[in-house]
């Protein structure tokens, strides 16, 4: 499946998304842009199964982590016409 995972700079470095991911797609990397000094990164997007647990776990009002499902998955869900 070709899913993409985007981490936005609204990330607060809480690690909730990393802990929620069952496929170890996300990891934390150093970043000076937040108090925690780290930000989520998605170096293994090819392993993403599109479960969106990382999105659900994100505590920010604007989801800092978003999963964009590939066309094949969207079509099988009946969302694309």
From Swiss-Prot:
GO MF terms held by the record: 4 iron, 4 sulfur cluster binding; electron transfer activity; metal ion binding; oxidoreductase activity
Keyword Transferase among record annotations: no
Catalytic reaction equation(s): reduced [plastocyanin] + hnu + oxidized [2Fe-2S]-[ferredoxin] = oxidized [plastocyanin] + reduced [2Fe-2S]-[ferredoxin]
Record's keyword terms, sorted: 4Fe-4S, Chloroplast, Electron transport, Iron, Iron-sulfur, Membrane, Metal-binding, Oxidoreductase, Photosynthesis, Photosystem I, Plastid, Repeat, Thylakoid, Transport
Membrane topology listed for this record: Peripheral membrane protein
Pfam families recorded: Fer4_7
Enzyme class: oxidoreductase
InterPro entries, per database record: 4Fe4S_Fe-S-bd, 4Fe4S_Fe_S_CS, PSI_iron-sulfur_center, PSI_PsaC
Textual note on the cofactor: Binds 2 [4Fe-4S] clusters. Cluster 2 is most probably the spectroscopically characterized electron acceptor FA and cluster 1 is most probably FB.
Protein name, entry field: Photosystem I iron-sulfur center
Gene name of the encoded protein: psaC
